[in-house]
């Protein structure tokens, strides 16, 4: 069967079993008190567009674990819902409403993945002007895509975050947080969208999930402009301690600057900086009294807060949209400043353009103010020269800056004349001078982002102070300490290397805005003008999964879901009879919801991508700790890295995104699952490569053919008691044990490697050692276990093959295969490895012999040699070993042979030989004679060492346990 035909057949098999699973509702668990439960969740997807294979990696791993736990006898709940709140969906809807061609065409292409009729596509696009229609359309399509990938989801519990019943739940959550004093109101610096005029969170900012946006606190320092009354150029810095080494100011000649009257002074900043200042001081009045280009400032003189006179010079690296758009130069410790100064010194023509005397610039020299052990001279200059940087536009200057700052921050000491700062560490001096500048009104705090950022509608994001902003205060001491302690001591995080990042994120979190004036979502119950933002309303929704289906079953209305209902259901507070009377919810329904929650909670495993560590997962932990009793706190978090394609990050602009819909149409669910699970460890970026995918298709074809042939073919009666039979059964059960352990520890790639690929390699080897008929019989023997063990990763194909075996029950509901530990036999595995090593050794010798021999004697070591190894392992003295063996076995005159064994096993440990019965070794080589002959082209004879010596076979005495000597002739 050709690959294309095989994939078509496989897709039909997948559709068949998806339909059967859905028809029989086999993934809709009920409470079973006598059965252990397992509650696993993955993030509910944001439904503003189709999902791609990067999302698919996370969801597939979640499903593999859900299926595995089900086979292990757990009552598994694996639910799903859809996230629609926030501003991203509204932003898309608005752009479609404005008639933006680019976004309309993109969304038409998305719709066309599911709808083929052009007229229908136009209708759907038109409907997207209502954001809810857009959200619901993609929620339904994601549902389809998840079904097409075979996810074992309980869809009864589905909801979306815009539903009134969910709004009632979030309302209760925020009332609980307020009740505990964790929601506060005040002036707060946030990431703010100039387009929408409101705070924006990570979910609302382009690429913020993979490239986080952080607010940095600059110190804006005032430099008095000579010749002007009460006027200051303001330069912002992250390193105010370097003010002692300032040599000049930098401005961008072509940038626009403004003179602004503010707080009784005139300050000069870039036009872009003024907008930021106005938003960071919203109650202050700013009056523009002058405008100029940067070139008009070049050549002017200023006085620093330390009293030093400095000149203003031109620099192209200055970004008017970064901080104040003015930079003070400290070339001793700032690589950008050092390179710009060196360039300018060589460019007299440029200086002449601005009327600056080149001699003045040539006299400017870096001032060393920080001493770092091992650094002689100016730190920035040394690093720049080592890296070979000569241009202020060299992107490596970013790394050079990091190197200098890192070394100075941890090792640097101030060597300035000022006794107040002399001898301080860089970190101490930084804080001290900052406080002094602010106290003396020689500077102020300026907030800036760590990178350029835009909302999903294209609005520019800045740092702004919101007056009366509602925020969740993650800095509350008891809350933060409880979260850190729980993660550190109780919570399991896999891969374990991310535990530190998780703890760091919890430690770093402080006050975070939790509401805004715009967007889909739940109104803040105590201030309805505000809408709860999308990361804050998605922290404990796992609890809602436990009751969502019951709310629908009992036709409970949103207005009936008063806070006391959730108090009872989730916390056990209140009298259910009184609550029933007050809300009109039947008592039975309340008790059923309480029972359902108590059975399923806590979350046993939360699986997601590493991008969620700094936000969603931190909030997930914090909010559970705040609201629920300890017994209901989540037990485990597991994570995976991202997916790229052919070595490149996937992006719409590159056109290299593979959507989940493409998997269903062009590939296959089981192909995708096997590849995505087996291509990389969880903590490794997975690189989707088509050539590798092609190889996986071949492997699936081979697996199917192996199973089909074993089922369709009758075989004779075999006792399976040969060494090679024992080897295969040992190998299979060992792989099954290792794969089970791998799944228990979330080592998904190892599980796939062992249970799929390594078992097939073992089958190939067994076939080569025996015959096709014997191989078919052996596969029949292990096939049931093999299918069960592979069901989590390739559920459709294994269900199909299971049905070929005449099985009527769903394989997905079977029990995980029993490991036959008695069959695991180190001895036969070592013997088989020794046979393979012997064949390689013979081949290596054959390659250098001419003419080619036709026969081979294989000499198996005498049993006394094994005894020598035993004595070596016990640590016996060499002379004692020689004496004991010589006397016991009558080897007088053959002491050199004993010494040879001792020497060889001292060089290369022979410990494995202790696992081998010498008679079994002899029998195994004899049994393998035909195989060895086939692989080497030689006639094979096997002898005991003593027999070989009697026949005068050369080098017979050189044989060792598991390392037989051989003679070719």
Swiss-Prot record:
GO molecular function: aminoacyl-tRNA deacylase activity; ATP binding; leucine-tRNA ligase activity
Protein EC: 6.1.1.4
GO CC, any one term: cytoplasm
Disulfide pairings: none
Protein name: Leucine--tRNA ligase
Record-listed ATP binding positions: 652
Signal sequence, start to end: none
InterPro entries: aa-tRNA-synth_I_CS, aa-tRNA-synth_Ia, Leu-tRNA-lgase_arc, Leu-tRNA-synth_Ia_arc/euk, M/V/L/I-tRNA-synth_anticd-bd, Rossmann-like_a/b/a_fold, tRNAsynth_Ia_anticodon-bd, Val/Leu/Ile-tRNA-synth_edit
Source species, domain of life: Archaea
């Amino acid at each position: 069967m050709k690959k294309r035909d095989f994939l078509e057949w496989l897709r039909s098999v997948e559709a068949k079993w998806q339909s059967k699973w859905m028809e029989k509702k086999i993934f809709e668990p009920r409470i079973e008190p006598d059965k252990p439960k397992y509650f696993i969740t993955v993030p509910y997807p944001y439904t503003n567009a189709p999902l791609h294979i990067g999302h698919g990696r996370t969801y597939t791993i979640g499903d593999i674990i859900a299926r595995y736990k089900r086979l292990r006898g757990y009552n598994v709940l694996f639910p799903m819902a859809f996230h629609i709140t926030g501003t991203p969906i509204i932003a898309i809807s608005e752009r479609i409403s404005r008639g933006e061609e680019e976004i309309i065409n993109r969304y038409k292409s998305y719709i066309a993945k599911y709808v083929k009729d052009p007229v229908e596509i136009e209708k759907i696009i038109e409907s997207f002007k209502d954001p809810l229609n857009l959200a619901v359309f993609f929620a339904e399509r994601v549902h389809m895509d998840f079904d097409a990938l075979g996810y074992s989801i309980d869809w009864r519990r589905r909801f979306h975050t815009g539903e009134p019943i969910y709004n009632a739940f979030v309302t209760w959550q925020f009332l609980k947080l307020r009740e505990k004093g964790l929601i506060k109101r005040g002036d707060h610096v946030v990431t703010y969208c100039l387009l929408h005029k409101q705070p924006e969170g990570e979910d609302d900012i382009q690429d913020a999930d993979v490239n986080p946006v952080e607010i940095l606190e600059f110190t804006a320092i005032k430099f008095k402009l000579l010749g002007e009354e009460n006027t200051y150029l303001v330069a912002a810095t992250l390193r105010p301690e370097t003010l002692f080494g300032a040599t000049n100011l930098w401005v961008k000649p072509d940038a626009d600057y403004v003179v602004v009257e503010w707080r009784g002074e005139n300050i000069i900043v870039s036009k872009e900086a003024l907008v930021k200042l106005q938003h960071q001081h919203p109650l202050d009045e700013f009056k523009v009294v002058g405008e100029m280009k940067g070139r008009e400032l070049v050549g002017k003189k200023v006085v620093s807060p330390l009293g030093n006179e400095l000149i203003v010079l031109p620099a192209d690296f200055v970004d008017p949209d970064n901080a104040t758009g003015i930079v003070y130069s400290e070339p001793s410790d700032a690589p950008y400043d050092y390179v710009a100064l060196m360039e300018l010194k060589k460019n007299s023509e440029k200086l002449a353009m601005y009327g600056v005397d080149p001699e003045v610039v040539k006299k400017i020299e870096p001032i060393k103010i920080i001493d770092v052990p091992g650094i002689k001279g100016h730190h920035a200059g040394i690093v720049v020269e080592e890296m070979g940087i000569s241009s202020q536009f060299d992107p490596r200057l970013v790394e050079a800056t990091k190197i200098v700052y890192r070394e100075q921050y941890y090792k640097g000491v101030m060597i300035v004349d000022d006794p107040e700062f002399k001898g301080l560490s860089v970190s101490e001096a930084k804080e001290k001078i900052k406080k002094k500048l602010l106290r003396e009104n020689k500077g102020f705090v300026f907030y800036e982002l760590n990178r350029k950022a835009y909302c999903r509608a294209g609005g520019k994001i800045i740092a702004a102070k919101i007056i009366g902003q509602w925020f969740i205060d993650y800095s509350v001491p008891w809350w933060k300490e409880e979260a850190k302690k729980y993660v550190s001591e109780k919570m399991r995080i896999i891969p374990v290397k991310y535990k530190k990042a998780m703890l760091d994120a919890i430690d770093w979190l402080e006050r975070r805005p939790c509401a805004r004036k715009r967007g889909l979502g739940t109104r803040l119950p105590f201030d309805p003008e505000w809408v709860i933002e999308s990361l804050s309303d998605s922290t404990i929704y796992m609890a809602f999964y436990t009751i969502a289906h019951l709310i629908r079953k009992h036709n409970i209305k949103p207005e009936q879901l008063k806070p006391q209902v959730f108090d009872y259901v989730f916390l056990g507070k209140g009298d259910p009879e009184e609550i029933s009377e007050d809300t009109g919810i039947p008592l039975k329904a309340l008790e059923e919801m309480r029972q359902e929650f108590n059975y399923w909670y806590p979350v046993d495993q939360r699986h997601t991508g590493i991008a969620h560590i700094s936000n969603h997962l931190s909030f997930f932990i914090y909010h559970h700790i705040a609201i629920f009793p300890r017994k209901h706190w989540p037990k485990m978090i597991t994570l995976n890295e991202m997916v790229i394609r052919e070595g490149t990050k996937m992006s719409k602009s590159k056109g290299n995104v593979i959507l989940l819909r493409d998997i269903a149409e062009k590939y296959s669910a089981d192909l995708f699952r096997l590849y995505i699970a087996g291509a990389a460890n969880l903590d490794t970026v997975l690189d989707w490569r088509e050539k590798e995918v092609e190889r996986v298709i071949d492997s699936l074809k081979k697996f199917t053919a192996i199973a089909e042939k074993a089922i369709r073919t009758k075989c004779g009666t075999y006792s399976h008691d040969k060494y090679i039979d024992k080897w295969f059964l040992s190998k299979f059960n060992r792989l099954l044990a290792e794969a089970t352990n791998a799944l228990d520890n979330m080592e998904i790639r190892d599980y796939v490697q062992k249970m799929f690929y390594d078992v097939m390699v073992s089958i190939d080897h067994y076939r080569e050692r025996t015959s096709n008929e014997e191989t078919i019989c052996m596969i029949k023997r292990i096939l049931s276990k093999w299918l069960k063990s592979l069901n989590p990763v390739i559920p459709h194909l294994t269900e199909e093959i299971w049905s070929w075996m005449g099985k009527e029950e769903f394989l997905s509901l079977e029990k995980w295969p029993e490991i036959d530990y008695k069959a695991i036999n180190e001895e036969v595995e070592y013997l088989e490895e020794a046979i393979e090593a012997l064949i390689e050794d013979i081949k290596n010798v054959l390659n250098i012999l001419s003419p080619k021999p036709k026969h081979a004697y294989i000499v198996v070591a005498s049993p006394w040699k094994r005894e020598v190894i035993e004595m070596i392992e016990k640590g016996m003295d060499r002379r004692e070993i020689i004496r004991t063996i010589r006397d016991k076995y009558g080897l007088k005159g053959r002491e050199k042979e004993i010494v040879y064994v001792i020497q060889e096993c001292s060089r290369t440990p022979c410990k494995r030989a202790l696992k081998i019965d010498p008679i079994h070794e002899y029998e195994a080589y004899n049994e393998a004679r035909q195989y060895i002959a086939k692989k080497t082209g030689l006639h094979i004879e096997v002898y005991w060492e003593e027999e070989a010596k009697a026949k005068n076979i050369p080098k017979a005495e050189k044989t060792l346990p598991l390392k037989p000597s051989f003679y070719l002739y």
